[in-house]
Amino acid sequence: MGKSNVIQIRLVSSAETGYFYVTKKNARSATGKMEVRKYDPVARKHVVFREAKIK
């Protein structure tokens, strides 16, 4: 069995509220940084979430 290509990443809010989502992505096919527009409940609006490493 080989090593899994799926890694966990942290999506951090660009509104700098400290809110984040944890999700998975395929490390082999999606090599760039992920940017997703999602809801930030602290800011109470949709903002861009950018990929960051899980500490």
From Swiss-Prot:
ATP-binding keyword on record: no
Disulphide bonds in the chain: none
Keyword Nucleotidyltransferase annotated: no
One of the record's GO cellular component terms: cytosolic large ribosomal subunit
GO biological process, one term: translation
Superkingdom in the source lineage: Bacteria
UniProt keyword terms in alphabetical order: Ribonucleoprotein, Ribosomal protein
GO molecular function, one term: structural constituent of ribosome
Record-linked PANTHER family: 54S RIBOSOMAL PROTEIN L39, MITOCHONDRIAL, LARGE RIBOSOMAL SUBUNIT PROTEIN BL33M
Family indicated by similarity: Belongs to the bacterial ribosomal protein bL33 family.
Protein name as it appears in the record: Large ribosomal subunit protein bL33
Organism phylogeny: Bacteria, Pseudomonadati, Pseudomonadota, Alphaproteobacteria, Acetobacterales
